[in-house]
Amino acid sequence: MAKKRISIMVVDDNDMMRTILRGVLRGEEYEVVGEARNGTIAVEMADRLKPDIICLDVIMPEKNGLEALCEIKAARPETEVVMITSNADPETVQEAIQNGASGFIIKPYNAARILNTLEKICERIRQRLA
């Protein structure tokens, strides 16, 4: 039986970073179902698209990733959210984990690290669905 493709939404205010992440996920067991450039759009899209996983940048205009994380988890607690940041200071990491983040990916992206992080999360999703 084939594995269910995991739906992912990519959120980053930097077009190039979204393109890189989308490229890393291409050809894998993931389907990028949406992209957003800020937290405000991300919250709206998450509610509409209902992705399994959201890769969410921390530092963005309008609504930052931590604010968006809180709103997304309040509306859809089953959605796994991986925070993306270039500066994983302990306070940010702690706040994100307390608010339901499933993991962290540090910029610049490393394809192996991204895929390893997402695979661990996918296993949790599959166990929950089994």
Regions of interest found by a model, annotated:
Residues N38-I41, N64-E67:
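Acidic catalytic/metal-coordinating carboxylates
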Residues M60:
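Receiver (REC) domain active-site loop signature in two-component systems and cognate sites
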Residues E91, Y109-E119:
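C-terminal output helix
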Residues D15-G34:
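Two-component/phosphorelay signaling modules centered on CheY-like receiver
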Residues L49-C55:
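Active-site beta3 strand of CheY-like receiver
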Residues N87-A88:
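Short, conserved "switch-loop" micro-motifs in signal-transduction and mechanochemical regulators
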